[in-house]
Each structure stands twice: as structure tokens, then as C-alpha cells.
């Protein structure tokens, strides 16, 4: 339990309904979202629900040295990284975003990853502010005009 009446579950994408209204903005913003979603049905997602309705989602991916970053406009050397593939939080539950970034950080530590990154468009001002408050810095652009933000993991 994260907050009153909010339940966090881990589910594979194949157990989610892509037609749920929660996904509409992702489908509208990323024209290939449905294709991407259907190609990753075994990937796990962290989901919060309130009254059986999705209120947030976090999808992570551990990348390795075989990853291709040719669409980045600045060198991004292949390395073991944690990518935040999808992070969407219903506006009424913004605090969950902070919890998800903590979860991503802990996942990076658990998997011996030195860097986390996320790509997003500049219209996501609240998310950019949240990232910057949590030690993410702007790194570069992608060819599709998304911005790349990174967080270097400090190990003690």
C-alpha cells in the first residue's frame, strides 16, 4: 500500500488492457505505443490502482552493451543501464512519481547498474521538474526530439 486506497501491483503487460483509458495519452503521444506494448507483453510493470482503476505505471528495462543509441545526438556509450521505458502518473497522484523514481534507483542498485535514463518530450514539465529534483540531468536529444535525462548512481 502506497497511500490510502492506492494499491501497488507488479503485472506483466499481457495482463493489462491496452484499451484502458489510462493508456490513451500514451497512444496519442507515441504513435507506435501499441506496437511497442504488444512486442513486450512479458515485460513487468509496476501499476497502482485506486478503486480498480489504473492511476500510474512504471516500466523498466535493464540494458546491456548491445543496446543501440544511434538516434541520440550525443555519444552514449553502450553500457549496462536501467531505462525507464514508461512512467505515467495520474495528475491527482503525483507523489507516486517520487516513489517510482526511488523504486527505479533501488532496482538499479540491485542490478549493479551505474546509470538510469529516461527519454521524454518537453511538454512533460511536471515530470521534468520531478526528475531534476531527483538528481536527473539533461544529457542530449534524440532524433525524434525527445530529451534524454540521466541519473548517475552514486554508490557508498
Language-model features: locations:
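Conserved GNAT acetyl-CoA-binding A-motif
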Residues: 108-122
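Conserved acyl-donor/pantetheine-binding loop and adjacent beta-alpha core of acyl/acetyltransferases
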Residues: 53-83
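Conserved acetyl-CoA-binding loop-helix of GNAT-fold acetyltransferases
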Residues: 94-108, 133
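A short, internal acetyl-CoA/4′-phosphopantetheine-binding micro-motif in the GNAT/acyltransferase core
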Residues: 85-95, 121
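Conserved active-site tyrosine of GNAT-family acetyltransferases
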Residues: 127-136
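Short hydrophobic/aromatic beta-strand element in the GNAT-like acyltransferase core
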Residues: 43-48, 57, 86
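Conserved catalytic-core motifs of GNAT/GCN5-like acyltransferases
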Residues: 119-120, 135-150
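Short amphipathic alpha-helix that is part of the acyltransferase structural core
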Residues: 1-40, 45-47
Amino acid at each position: 500500500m502506497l497511500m490510502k486506497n492506492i494499491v501497488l501491483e507488479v503485472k506483466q503487460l499481457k495482463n493489462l488492457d491496452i484499451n484502458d483509458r489510462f493508456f490513451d495519452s500514451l497512444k496519442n503521444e507515441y504513435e507506435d505505443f501499441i506496437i511497442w506494448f504488444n512486442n513486450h507483453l512479458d515485460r513487468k510493470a509496476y501499476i497502482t490502482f485506486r478503486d480498480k482503476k489504473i492511476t500510474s505505471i512504471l516500466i523498466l528495462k535493464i540494458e546491456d552493451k548491445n543496446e543501440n543509441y544511434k538516434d541520440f545526438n550525443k555519444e552514449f556509450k553502450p553500457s549496462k543501464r536501467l531505462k525507464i521505458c514508461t512512467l505515467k502518473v495520474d495528475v491527482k497522484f503525483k507523489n507516486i512519481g517520487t516513489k517510482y523514481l526511488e523504486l527505479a534507483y533501488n532496482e538499479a542498485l540491485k542490478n549493479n547498474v551505474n546509470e538510469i535514463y529516461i527519454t521524454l518530450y518537453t511538454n512533460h514539465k511536471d515530470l521534468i521538474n520531478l526528475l531534476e529534483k531527483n538528481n536527473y540531468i539533461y544529457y542530449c536529444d534524440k532524433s525524434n526530439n525527445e530529451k534524454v535525462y540521466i541519473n548517475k548512481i552514486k554508490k557508498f
